[in-house]
Amino acid sequence: MNEVFNFSAGPAMLPKQVLRQVKEELYSWNNMGVSVIEISHRSKEFLQLMQEAKQDMRDLLDITENYEVLFCHGGARAQFSAIPMNLLKTSSERVDYIITGYWAYNAAIEAKKYCDPRIINVVGEKNGLHNIQPISKWDVSENSLYIHYCPNETIDGIAVYETPNFSDKIVVADCSSTLFSGPLNINRFGIIYATAQKNIGISGLTVIIIRKDLLKEPCLVVPSILNYKILADNFSMFNTPVTMSWYVASLIFKWLKKQGGLKEINKRNQEKSALLYDAIDSSNFYYNNISLSNRSYMNIPFFLKNSKLNDLFLKESISFGLHGLKGHKVVGGMRASLYNAMTLEGVKKLIRFMKLFSEKYR
């Protein structure tokens, strides 16, 4: 059978080993004779799964004890509201939103419902290539309570590889597409959040890493389900959690450990993206519009110089066993998402197809 590879930005490809385990355990999990999707979330077996998942997450990311790990329902968009509601004392407090692309901008727009965020655009263009200013040049307010940014924009394919170091501010990061793709200095951040359907498993779950001193009763009115203190006090079980998503995340964490941890995963991710970028740059048929220093290694947009071939490229790529390559409607073109589960073989197959297609229609 022709092996199929899924390059979708999310929900994204899962490791084959994890998919097989889910299939094997779906009808009878943990030798219980019942499925993990029907077991009580307060059973001792599921509570053990939860504790192991949190510990594995701490081990992988080297999360220190002054941080809490929360497993929340829903996607990252919910956190666009939850963050200002949980952190602000009044709606007049100054906050900074660094705009690196589509998702950072959407977070800022949502924050406007609760405060007057200062929007700081750090994206520029030189010689037709988009770039991001170095952090040292970001025009951050002296008196802002927190700074929010997105280190990797999945739609734009642009990334910030520096880690902010603002000791006098709460640094909040939407790491939905990069968390677990490599090591991260957690202690530079106040809050990190990431939706699961990219590198953590399946949709329905968002993980939050929050400094414990920020777990205070909010001053603004916050729905209980978005109240970080309530979630922490109830061990992320204030409501019935998305048990299937928690279960798959727990398998992903075990899989990451078996692969050698995040340094090894990052090495593989760098290798995969380097191969694809090289194929794009050397083709004279495809192109990428991001500067070298800000190219994402998770989400790689590329364009055909003859855009009239776009539909044909997508049609033939599916026949070749390559799915999810259509670019986002905001950007257009193509996009290959190379999350942790994407194999080197999958990237090489994409490159083979791109070469064959270019030779056929050049």
Swiss-Prot record:
Pathway: Amino-acid biosynthesis; L-serine biosynthesis; L-serine from 3-phospho-D-glycerate: step 2/3; Cofactor biosynthesis; pyridoxine 5'-phosphate biosynthesis; pyridoxine 5'-phosphate from D-erythrose 4-phosphate: step 3/5. SUPFAM superfamilies: PLP-dependent transferases. Pyridoxal 5'-phosphate binds at A76, R77, W103, T154, D174, Q197, N239, T240. GO terms for cellular component: cytoplasm. It catalyses: O-phospho-L-serine + 2-oxoglutarate = 3-phosphooxypyruvate + L-glutamate; 4-(phosphooxy)-L-threonine + 2-oxoglutarate = (R)-3-hydroxy-2-oxo-4-phosphooxybutanoate + L-glutamate. L-glutamate binds at R42. It is found in: Cytoplasm. One of its GO terms (molecular function) is pyridoxal phosphate binding. Its cofactor is pyridoxal 5'-phosphate. The modification N6-(pyridoxal phosphate)lysine is found at K198. Catalyzes the reversible conversion of 3-phosphohydroxypyruvate to phosphoserine and of 3-hydroxy-2-oxo-4-phosphonooxybutanoate to phosphohydroxythreonine. This is Phosphoserine aminotransferase. The lineage of its organism: Bacteria, Pseudomonadati, Pseudomonadota, Gammaproteobacteria, Enterobacterales. The gene is serC.
